[in-house]
Amino acid sequence: MDWKLEGSAQKTESRVLQEHEITLDDPGEDGVSESFQLLQIDVGCEHWEQETLPTGSAAWCSKNVQRKQRHWEKIVAAKKSKRKQEKERRKANRVENSGIYPQHSKRFLRSLIKERLLEAKHSGPRLCIDLSMTNHMSKKELSRLAGQIRRLYGSNKKADRPFWIYLTGFTTDSPLYEECLRMNDGFSSYLLDRTEEDCFSLFPLETLVYLTPDSDHALENVDLNKVYILGGLVDESIQKKVTFQKAQEHSVKTARLPIQEYMVKCQNGKNYHSEILTINQVFDILSTYFETQNWPEALKKGVSSRKGYVLRNSVE
């Protein structure tokens, strides 16, 4: 009897323990299940929020986000506008470079340019770039001068009546020559004369006219019997009268562009007025005058308002 009661008690205890274990296990499984349900609810909510978020609505965007969006749209619009302007500029350049022969090939145009330049060598006006003053120029100044030579040559190729160009005092072992090769594609094939001689020994002195802003004499016209000299000098320290003094040392005539005769000073924020121009700007003026025989038109092309000068008739 006692054994039966003891066995029954053991069975009852075992059943209770099993039920207790099951009870302990069930909440764990329910807890995990509940956690999965919560995660599913969160994901569902996030998915619902994404689906129901009204795109572009100010109600769902902060002012900062809207401001950044407007800023980005402005940048994109500006880039599109810039690309369009660049495309139009290239198109205009192609038309300009082709001159009155837009229907002809590039090969024909190159042949035409070559023919004009070689004709200028025999019967056109002559321009000499005096490069004998580059020994003390910095690399930055040499780079700027090389760029000016490139632009000058480019303008001369486009001209209907080009000049024949001489680069004097120019040696192939000079830093300037290396800079010209580095910066200017096809420089070694430029149709112009390069020589180590200086301009004063290359031409008769009576045929030379040194163009310098320090001269007292204004240039009246472009004479085919003269050789016009431009000082190949880029000097950030702005030493005054360097080219004028060099011309005087060799007893060569000087002249300045007639800026004072056809232009007047204008007011600007910096109260800045200067007649000092780059060699390519001076050349643009000479070339335009030679084609048009009109100083106001020529000066307008080469002297920008940033120099502090405007044409007289524009203020009268």
Swiss-Prot record:
GO molecular function: tRNA (guanosine(9)-N1)-methyltransferase activity; tRNA binding
Catalytic activity from the UniProt record: guanosine(9) in tRNA + S-adenosyl-L-methionine = N(1)-methylguanosine(9) in tRNA + S-adenosyl-L-homocysteine + H(+)
GO terms for biological process, alphabetical: tRNA N1-guanine methylation
Keyword entries, A-Z: Coiled coil, Methyltransferase, S-adenosyl-L-methionine, Transferase
Pfam hit, one: tRNA_m1G_MT
GO annotation, cellular component aspect: nucleoplasm; nucleus
Documented EC number(s): 2.1.1.221
Key word Ribosomal protein present: no
Keyword S-adenosyl-L-methionine (UniProt): yes
Coiled-coil residues: 73-98
Broad enzyme group: transferase
Gene3D superfamilies the record matches: 3.40.1280.30
Disordered, as annotated region: 77-96
Residues of the SAM-dependent MTase TRM10-type domain: 113-310
Known role: S-adenosyl-L-methionine-dependent guanine N(1)-methyltransferase that catalyzes the formation of N(1)-methylguanine at position 9 (m1G9) in tRNAs. Probably not able to catalyze formation of N(1)-methyladenine at position 9 (m1A9) in tRNAs.
Family, per entry: Belongs to the class IV-like SAM-binding methyltransferase superfamily. TRM10 family.
Protein name: tRNA methyltransferase 10 homolog B
Organism: Bos taurus
Organism lineage string: Eukaryota, Metazoa, Chordata, Craniata, Vertebrata
